[in-house]
């Protein structure tokens, strides 16, 4: 995927619902609110060392904004948002927008397009290896005593004498950045600036997400 197509939108996960096709099939979709994405800065190769659009979404009280951030937003002429992000783009794409511009969803996405959605997964607290890493339980009987759901050996003996980093063990599960790839845009509500995306996206209701054109989108079967 070229950088010119990497411009996306910040949004909020509203929830899930279903749509019906003309054939009567039910399609599960996630509703994402991508309204009022404002450009807060156009980064250039000369000034910043790379080309990108800095975007903010949502609204925040002025009393909750730091003075440096307030000055930055005032320079762009936009109100403070709840979340801010960047999208790397080409100079041609960056030239189409200026600080204070609003990114309309209909210009960036289309029905049937493949998108990647990034968000923070739902936290599940402390979890064992069976739930966290899909391990299987050990024997229920036949010599097994009080070791039914333990992971088993986690390392070797004196050599190397330690547990290697990255070993799959018990620990905190969820609450991490997750990207779900190649989801279909089923419908676009221009009036309310909503994206209806097929399937589930990371995070809980009200969580912030980033929607980008899919980086691994496959060409259609009819393409040469």
UniProtKB/Swiss-Prot annotation:
GO biological process: translation
Oligomer and partners: Part of the 50S ribosomal subunit. Forms a cluster with proteins L14 and L19.
Modified positions (N5-methylglutamine) in chain numbering: 158
GO cellular component entries: cytosolic large ribosomal subunit
Superkingdom, natural source: Bacteria
Entry keyword Ribosomal protein: yes
Ranges of compositional bias, category Polar residues: 137-156
UniProt name for this protein: Large ribosomal subunit protein uL3
Pfam family, one: Ribosomal_L3
Function: One of the primary rRNA binding proteins, it binds directly near the 3'-end of the 23S rRNA, where it nucleates assembly of the 50S subunit.
Molecular function via GO: rRNA binding; structural constituent of ribosome
Keywords: Methylation, Ribonucleoprotein, Ribosomal protein, RNA-binding, rRNA-binding
Family stated for the protein in its record: Belongs to the universal ribosomal protein uL3 family.
HAMAP family hit by this protein: Ribosomal_uL3_B (MF_01325_B)
SUPFAM superfamilies in alphabetical order: Translation proteins
PROSITE patterns in the record: RIBOSOMAL_L3 (PS00474)
Region (Disordered): 137-160
InterPro entries: Ribosomal_uL3, Ribosomal_uL3_bac/org-type, Ribosomal_uL3_CS, Transl_B-barrel_sf
Post-translational modification: Methylated by PrmB.
Gene, per the UniProt record: rplC
């Amino acid at each position: 995927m070229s950088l010119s197509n990497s411009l996306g939108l910040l949004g909020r996960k509203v929830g899930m619902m279903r749509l019906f096709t003309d054939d009567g099939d039910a399609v599960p979709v996630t509703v994402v609110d991508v309204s009022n994405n404002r450009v807060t800065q156009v980064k250039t190769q000369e000034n910043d060392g790379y080309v990108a659009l800095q975007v903010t979404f949502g609204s925040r009280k002025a009393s909750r904004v730091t003075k440096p951030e307030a000055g930055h937003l005032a320079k762009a002429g936009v109100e403070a948002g709840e979340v801010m992000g960047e999208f790397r783009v080409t100079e041609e794409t960056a030239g189409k927008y200026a600080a204070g511009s609003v990114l309309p969803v209909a210009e960036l996405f289309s029905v049937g397009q493949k998108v990647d959605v990034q968000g923070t997964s739902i936290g599940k607290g402390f979890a064992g290896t069976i739930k966290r890493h899909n391990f299987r339980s050990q024997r229920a009987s036949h010599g097994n005593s009080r070791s039914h759901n333990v992971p088993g050996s986690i390392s070797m003996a004196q050599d190397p004498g330690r547990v290697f980093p990255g070993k799959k063990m018990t620990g905190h599960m969820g609450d991490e950045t997750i990207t779900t790839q190649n989801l279909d845009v089923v419908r676009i509500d221009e009036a309310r600036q909503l994206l209806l995306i097929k399937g589930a996206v990371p995070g809980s209701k009200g969580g912030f997400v980033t929607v980008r054109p899919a980086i691994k989108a496959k060409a259609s079967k009819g393409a040469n």
